[in-house]
Amino acid sequence: MEALGINPTLFIAQLINFLLLIFILRALLYRPVMNLLNERTRRIEESVRDAEKVREQLANARRDYEAEIARARQEAAKIVAQAQERAKQQEAEIIAQARREAERLKEEARAQAEQERIRMLSEAKSQIADLVTLTASRVLGAELQARGHDALIAESLAALDRRN
């Protein structure tokens, strides 16, 4: 070895120094660095798991939100349909009430017209009876007796009823 220019004691001392340096570096640097790298890897994996959990929770929250929105829309549509149905029922009730009121007013008008017709007919009969009596009195020149007067009125009214 000396022929190569290598001093064997120096070589052994340097080899021992190198091995000692490797042992010291391994004990002082390699293990802490490896522990640091392992810890970092563990934290990264944990962060990835946490991110995946958050993503799943977000997806679940989104599904819940969409389901709630769909439920709210259905509820709103149901409320609108119920309101429309109630409006139709109220409309039908109002129309029926208006028809009943119109029919009642029509019947009242018809009854009043019938009463007015009867009253006018009664007045007309009375006036005609008076006119017949007056005319008969003038034509005959004398006042009819009460009995004859009543018979003449009845006959005139019967003739008038036959015309109507």
UniProtKB/Swiss-Prot annotation:
Subcellular location: Cell membrane
Lineage, opening ranks: Bacteria, Bacillati, Chloroflexota, Chloroflexia, Chloroflexales
Membrane topology listed for this record: Single-pass membrane protein
This protein's name: ATP synthase subunit b
The keyword Hydrolase is assigned to this record: no
Keywords: ATP synthesis, Cell membrane, CF(0), Hydrogen ion transport, Ion transport, Membrane, Transmembrane, Transmembrane helix, Transport
Assembly description: F-type ATPases have 2 components, F(1) - the catalytic core - and F(0) - the membrane proton channel. F(1) has five subunits: alpha(3), beta(3), gamma(1), delta(1), epsilon(1). F(0) has four main subunits: a(1), b(2) and c(10-14). The alpha and beta chains form an alternating ring which encloses part of the gamma chain. F(1) is attached to F(0) by a central stalk formed by the gamma and epsilon chains, while a peripheral stalk is formed by the delta and b chains.
GO molecular function annotations of the record: proton-transporting ATP synthase activity, rotational mechanism
Transmembrane segments: 4-24
Recorded family membership: Belongs to the ATPase B chain family.
InterPro entries, per the entry: ATP_synth_B-like_membr_sf, ATP_synth_b/b'su_bac/chlpt, ATP_synth_F0_bsu_bac, ATP_synthase_B_chain
Gene3D superfamilies referenced in this protein's UniProt entry, alphabetically: 6.10.250.1580, F1F0 ATP synthase subunit B, membrane domain
Pfam family, one: ATP-synt_B
Function recorded in the entry: F(1)F(0) ATP synthase produces ATP from ADP in the presence of a proton or sodium gradient. F-type ATPases consist of two structural domains, F(1) containing the extramembraneous catalytic core and F(0) containing the membrane proton channel, linked together by a central stalk and a peripheral stalk. During catalysis, ATP synthesis in the catalytic domain of F(1) is coupled via a rotary mechanism of the central stalk subunits to proton translocation.
A GO CC annotation given for this chain: proton-transporting ATP synthase complex
Organism: Chloroflexus aurantiacus (strain ATCC 29366 / DSM 635 / J-10-fl)
